[in-house]
Design a protein with these regions (language model features):
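Short alpha-helical transmembrane segments in multi-pass integral membrane proteins
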Residues: 1-18, 78-144, 190-248, 304-369, ...
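N-terminal transmembrane alpha-helices
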Residues: 6-37, 41-45, 58-73, 77, ...
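Transmembrane helical elements of multi-pass membrane transporters/channels
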Residues: 16-35, 138, 158, 172, ...
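Transmembrane alpha-helix boundary and packing residues in multipass membrane permease domains
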Residues: 21, 25, 36-37, 76, ...
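Helix-terminus/linker motif at the lipid-water interface of multi-pass membrane proteins
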Residues: 26, 30-51, 119-126, 182-193, ...
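Alpha-helical transmembrane segments and their lipid-water interface positions
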Residues: 28, 32-39, 64-71, 75, ...
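Small-residue-rich hydrophobic transmembrane alpha-helices
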Residues: 50-109, 113, 146-165, 278-342, ...
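Short runs within selected transmembrane alpha-helices of multi-pass transporters and secretion channels
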Residues: 68-71, 139-157, 165-173, 198-214, ...
Length: 452
């Protein structure tokens, strides 16, 4: 039987970690929101600029999320060591992570630039692709800075500090809006650049992010000590393999998930520019709710990794259940909000009547899959925390590649449901997420039996 008193302390501990991560995650997605809103207003009744940033952002996102996903593997490793008080090994992971993840950022940047010729073969209107490419290039140039920032961010999350990343992201978001205002609209003597100006603003703010967080590390003695522990002797192929072993399944899971969203966005382009813009509005809203879900999932990983490091099964079980309670409550709230305001929200993005009408219908469908999405992300967070990540990728493949995209295509094109059919594919695709709960419960049983 559920008793609030049993979980009160767990809710407080989870929320203490999750709320700053919520602000950080929202801050990251609000970079794209700011670009879309300001470019959408710049375009007025012409949906091309908004469609361009939507398309460019979608293509960028798929490799961006794959790179960032590998860095997420650092958090549970540091969380376990933090609970065990092993500062020396934590410093070694940080040192190797900085080298590995930053080099990975340059690699991802190169891959993103190599994709540019393919953008003309994705079924999008030529004028949309022409406008999207300069914006996309500037986003690609930001990848090394993103990966450098994420190395420090994931380390801090591992030691239970989620506030610093929040402050850095908020400050850089304000910078992004200011730079957008200058470059998109041509203020302070600069040329009016439209969508390209949004890319410049985003690049500038992302360069500032690692500078700020590195400055914090050097300012605080307890974190500077980790940097002072760096030594050429600490570079280790074995350590990098461990980072890759943890990060790669997470990255592939996020890559497949992003592929489903990007694939859906590309198929929207096969319908019309109106569908592209309406989908971007609906997905931007869904992403805002999703980022809060992933924040709860990230906090879950931190709590679970600390409990796992301390080998406290009872605390781990309570923390996991509390995370499920929190995410279910949030997703119910989000779904009700989307349904209530589906006709109002699109008007903040555009004045085009056709886009507003279609976006309001898509927002209703976004509300449908909120609950399953939340349960899936908390389950993934738990499995990351106990370092059981191998199962994550196969289930993601089943969800997004076997179910989501084919069903979306079937409904959207074969059965003629259009944009609404493509979005309904996500509802079907999230069904296999229940297997993640089965895996977590199996791990707990094995741990109780002394197998883990």
């Amino acid at each position: 039987m559920y008793r609030f008193s049993t979980y009160k302390r767990q809710y407080k501990a989870n929320l203490k970690l999750a709320l700053p991560v919520v602000m950080t995650q929202l801050g990251q997605i609000l970079v794209q929101v700011a670009d879309n809103v300001m470019v959408g207003r710049y375009g007025g009744d012409d949906p091309t600029p908004l469609a361009a940033t939507s398309f460019g952002g979608s293509v960028f996102f798929i490799l961006f999320i794959a790179g960032v996903g590998i860095a997420l593997g650092l958090t549970p490793l540091i969380g376990e060591l933090y609970a065990q008080g092993d500062r020396c090994k934590s410093s070694q992971y940080l040192q190797n992570g900085l080298m590995f993840y930053t080099l990975l950022g340059f690699l991802v940047c190169g891959l993103q630039l190599a994709v540019i010729p393919l953008m003309y073969h994705m079924g999008q209107p030529v004028e949309v692709v022409d406008m999207a490419i300069p914006y996309y290039k500037l986003l690609a140039y930001s990848m090394p800075f993103i990966m450098l920032f994420f190395t420090f961010k994931q380390f801090l999350e591992g030691v239970g500090n989620t506030r610093v990343e929040m402050v850095v992201v908020i400050l850089c978001n304000l910078m992004n809006v200011g730079l957008n205002w200058i470059f998109i609209y041509g203020h302070l003597g600069f040329e009016e650049l439209g969508a390209t100006g949004a890319g410049l603003g985003t690049l500038g703010s992302r360069i500032a992010m690692p500078i700020m967080i590195i400055g914090y590390f050097y300012k605080k003695q307890k974190y500077r000590a980790y940097l002072q522990g760096f030594s050429p002797r600490n570079y280790s192929v074995k350590t990098i393999r461990t980072l890759l072993r943890m990060g790669l399944p997470i990255s592939l899971q996020m890559f497949l998930e992003a592929s489903a969203f990007v694939g859906t966005s590309i198929m929207m382009g096969w319908l019309s520019k109106t569908a592209i813009s309406a989908n971007q509005i609906a997905m931007t809203l869904g992403n805002c709710a999703f980022m809060i879900v992933t924040s709860i999932g990230a906090a879950t990983t931190i709590r679970i990794s600390h409990c796992y490091g301390a080998r406290s099964l009872k605390e781990l079980t309570l923390a996991a259940k509390a995370s499920y309670h929190l995410v279910i409550a949030w997703n119910l709230f989000a779904a009700i909000t989307f349904i209530s305001l589906c006709n109002v929200i699109p008007t903040f993005f555009t004045t085009n009547a056709e886009v507003i009408d279609l976006a309001s219908k898509l927002i209703l469908l976004i509300a449908v899959y909120q609950l399953a999405d939340g349960i899936q992300n908390v389950s993934v967070g738990i499995l990351r925390g106990i370092q059981d990540v191998k199962i994550i990728m196969p289930i993601a493949f089943l969800s997004y590649i076997v179910f989501n995209l084919p069903v979306g295509y079937l409904l959207g094109f074969t059965l003629g449901m259009g944009a609404q059919g493509l979005i309904l594919g996500f509802t079907v695709g999230l069904t296999p997420a229940v297997l993640l709960i089965v895996r977590y419960r199996r791990d707990i049983r094995r741990w109780k039996a002394g197998i883990r």
